[in-house]
Amino acid sequence: MRSTSRTRRRTVAIAATLMAGGLVWGAGPTAFADVSAGLPAEVSPADQAALLGDTNAIRQKEGAPPISWDEGLASGSQSWADNPGSHAGGLKHDLGFNDGAENMSSAGPSQSVSQWAGEKAAYDAAGPNWNTDDPSYRYWGHYWNMVQKNYTRMGCGAADGVTVCRYA
């Protein structure tokens, strides 16, 4: 009986310590950057310009009009990137976001667009009948999201181990 009570107290103490550590680490972007795998804890102004410029260069090649940066999409992307549920055990899309498209990458912001652009060959091979329900969509869907002509805005966020970009 005593060992059960002692174990319970230790478990509570350990949990409290871990939660307090999480609050400290979550207190600001630099705190995450110190313990990350070298990925930024948020999208810097330079990253923002590069993400937008690189995306628009790809869109231009596909005949799609340029898109603009949207702070609302960026804020939502940052919130999802900061949520441990977005990348614990693998990348997971925000099922609550249904106002456009969402791309996710375990690469940093400076590499994400080129990673998604690398799907162009699979996109071209899919032909003119793109079916987002087809299992092959995962091989070209990020590229497709970037070049959709009906999307006019984008915003991105980043945290330790994940970059999220949303398009609407």
Q: Where are these predicted regions, by residue range?
A:
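Secretory targeting and sorting signals
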Residues: 1-34
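Short alpha-helical segments used as structural interaction elements across diverse proteins
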Residues: 5-7, 56, 117
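Glycine-rich, histidine-containing beta strand-loop boundary motifs that form or position
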Residues: 27, 71, 158
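Short, well-ordered surface patches within globular domains
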Residues: 39, 43-100
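A well-ordered secondary-structure block
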Residues: 97-168
